[in-house]
A protein has these predicted regions:
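Short beta-strand-to-loop acidic/aromatic patch adjacent to the donor-nucleotide binding site
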Residues: 17-31
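Structured catalytic cores of enzymes that bind and process phosphorylated ligands/cofactors
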Residues: 23, 38-42, 48-55, 140, ...
Length: 173
């Protein structure tokens, strides 16, 4: 069961009447995320044709472009464009992908119907190969938008990251 499936199950449990029409999936491993980034993610649903919105920031370091642990969002952002439809998610861009590259930040805003549909779908072939569950949505014609943000939150995945996050949060308070 992927995180989207768990979010959908929790929403059904907490809101069986369907009162809430949108939901944000913000995971606890991003404690330093800028609240404005969350607002921008939600704003990605302003266009009625968008089913799911997420956020990305421009990749500056060449080592991040080649790092398969940094998921890249393939979308025509930049040149004054703040929101775009997502074409693909990749771990290692190929020659068919043009720079600049955008680092995906694992925050999502869903329309409830889209989340329910997404959670009911089987794992897609590309999702299984690339180990990127967001490809299940793209492979099943759910429209995803990405909103550009300027800051990259610290992702906490090791004890050293936790200490760095604590230091950052102390400085803010």
């Amino acid at each position: 069961m992927c995180i989207r499936d768990r979010v959908a199950a929790a929403l059904k449990l907490r809101d069986p009447q369907g009162k809430y029409t949108t939901v944000v999936n913000l995971q606890g491993d991003l404690p330093t995320i800028d609240p404005l980034a969350i607002q921008r993610c939600l704003a990605g649903l302003t266009n009625e044709t968008v089913d799911i919105a997420t956020i990305a920031t421009r990749i500056e370091a060449e080592t991040d472009v080649s790092n398969p642990n940094v998921v890249k969002t393939i979308a025509p952002l930049g040149e004054g464009r703040e929101v775009a439809y997502i074409r693909d998610f990749v771990r290692s861009p190929g020659p068919e992908h043009d720079a600049p590259f955008w680092r995906h930040i694992n925050v999502y805003a869903y329309r409830r119907e889209a989340l329910d549909r997404f959670a009911s779908l089987p794992v897609s072939t590309r999702e299984a190969i690339r180990k990127l569950e967001q490809l299940r949505a793209l492979d099943n014609d759910l429209r995803m938008a990405v909103v550009r943000v300027d800051s990259l939150p610290l992702s906490v995945s090791a004890p050293v990251d936790l200490e760095a996050a604590r230091m950052m949060l102390r400085k803010k308070s």
